[in-house]
């Protein structure tokens, strides 16, 4: 479906600086060993050993796999993406709450606040007490609009928080979009 390279806008000394995101239409495609980077010379004319050379310069974290549950596809290119991680007691209740309250509210109001896309995904791997089980993302056109979201302003106003499943955010990094492809609809 597409990919994006994101840069953390405020990393700590031991945090990651960049995040590479691959989006696939389904689990089978994500688990396919014949992905383009294994056949990069045929697909883009660059040998795989060039793509993977000099990895000693980089510190890699692990791979995290999520499955999209709800989405408002981007209506314009995103400049910034806010990643919101949480581990609710009841993932299904959180998804139902987001579908009932957040999705229609954002669809109706996002254009007035620079929000260009939104989604909710559940963690496939890794799982456990040290890993968030749910991730929401909010895509914005500008840094200022993303920061208004973090401040509880803009599109966040008017959400019925008293009716929604409570989210305790474990981490909310704000990422700058360095490069991205457009998802095919």
Indicate residue ranges for each PLM-predicted region:
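Short S/T/G/P-rich N-terminal loop/turn motif that feeds into the first structured element of a domain
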Residues: 1-45, 50-185
